């Protein structure tokens, strides 16, 4: 359904019957199996691209922080940054890149179904995770070097954004990550 939406097709027919949960699960398993059939190289390039695309969230948040710090209330700043956060995820969805949080659920289904081995799952997860990290790091290095030099991002915006992300104890960060992964899996289920 999301693919149809992105292609600009019309809304689903209201007369059509909703899919049964078994049909959705089968589609999710098939989608997961297709990921395992991709070459490691293509999977890595897609994951690397997703890491770069997610960086646009930080770029936009850092730019907005630099432009509006001290000019708007802290509450307005928090809202502005929260609204701008999803842009990188939108790029990932439109670009059909491979983000690790998507694979935590989607790739697990064929393993639970017995279609794919646990070893293959770990290989896929490693490729996607490493690709995401390398893409994200490269984007970050470029952003940190170029942003302040050109003047569209102040250095203190990086400190502000990082502090907001890691200013919690480890278990809060862990459970937040688990919740985010679960929500991405749920999103995959809902758009099917």
Where are these regions (language model features)?
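Alpha-helical transmembrane segments and their helix-helix packing motifs
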Residues: 2-192
């Amino acid at each position: 359904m999301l693919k149809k939406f992105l292609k600009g097709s019309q809304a689903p027919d209201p007369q059509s019957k909703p899919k049964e949960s078994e049909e959705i699960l089968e589609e999710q398993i098939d989608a997961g199996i297709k990921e395992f059939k991709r070459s490691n190289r293509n999977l890595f390039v897609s994951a690397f691209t997703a890491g770069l695309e997610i960086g646009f969230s930080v770029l936009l948040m850092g730019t907005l922080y630099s432009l509006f710090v001290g000019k708007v209330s802290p509450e307005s700043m928090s809202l502005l940054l929260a609204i701008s956060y999803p842009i990188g995820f939108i790029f990932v969805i439109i670009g059909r890149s491979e983000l690790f949080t998507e694979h935590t659920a989607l790739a697990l289904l064929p393993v639970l179904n017995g279609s794919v081995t646990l070893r293959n799952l770990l290989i896929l997860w490693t490729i996607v995770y490493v690709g995401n990290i390398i893409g994200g790091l490269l984007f970050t290095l470029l952003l940190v070097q170029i942003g302040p030099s050109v003047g569209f991002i102040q250095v203190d915006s990086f400190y502000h954004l990082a502090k907001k992300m890691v200013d919690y104890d480890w278990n809060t960060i862990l459970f937040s990550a688990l919740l985010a992964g679960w929500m991405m899996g749920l999103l995959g289920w809902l758009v099917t």
